[in-house]
């Protein structure tokens, strides 16, 4: 096994050679551009997402004309049902609710209300 002094000298020589090689490439690039490969350009950002347009979607679908004509009316009716469900939930009697939904996994009445509101936000 070589001594520590020998290892230090070998390491210093390798380090000096690496530095010299670096300067050689820098000088060669300055004299003759194109010797080194060009740097990799940064990735281009993705194009902005187009906002969802329900009317445009309905035009592209192959649904029957009757469905296309009435889809907005049906969507409004569904929205009305959901909003009335929320209002009904807010006015619901706590004891009646807990009596009807015993064993459904609701810890409290407020827990059930919060779960229902989360469900409505998702859909």
Curated annotation (Swiss-Prot):
Keywords for the protein's UniProt record, in alphabetical order: Host membrane, Late protein, Membrane, Transmembrane, Transmembrane helix, Virion
Membrane topology listed for this record: Single-pass membrane protein
Subcellular location: Host membrane; Virion
Annotated stretches, region: Disordered: 33-54
Inducing factors: Expressed in the late phase of the viral replicative cycle.
Transmembrane segments annotated in the record for this chain: 5-25
Record's signal peptide: none
Extent of Pro residues compositional bias: 35-47
Stated name of the protein: Uncharacterized protein CP123L
Entry similarity comment: Belongs to the asfivirus CP123L family.
Entry GO CC: host cell membrane; membrane; virion component
UniProt KW Transmembrane helix keyword: yes
């Amino acid at each position: 096994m070589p001594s520590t002094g020998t290892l230090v000298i070998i390491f210093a020589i390798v380090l000096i050679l690496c530095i010299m090689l670096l300067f050689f490439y820098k000088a060669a690039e300055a004299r003759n551009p194109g010797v080194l490969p060009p740097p990799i350009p940064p990735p281009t950002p993705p194009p902005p997402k187009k906002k969802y347009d329900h009317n445009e979607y309905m035009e592209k679908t192959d649904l029957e004309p009757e469905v296309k004509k009435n889809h907005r009316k049906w969507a409004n009716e569904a929205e009305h049902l959901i909003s009335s469900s929320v209002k009904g939930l807010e006015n619901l009697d706590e004891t009646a609710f807990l009596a009807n939904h015993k064993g459904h996994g609701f810890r409290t009445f407020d827990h059930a209300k919060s779960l229902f509101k989360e469900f409505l936000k998702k859909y």
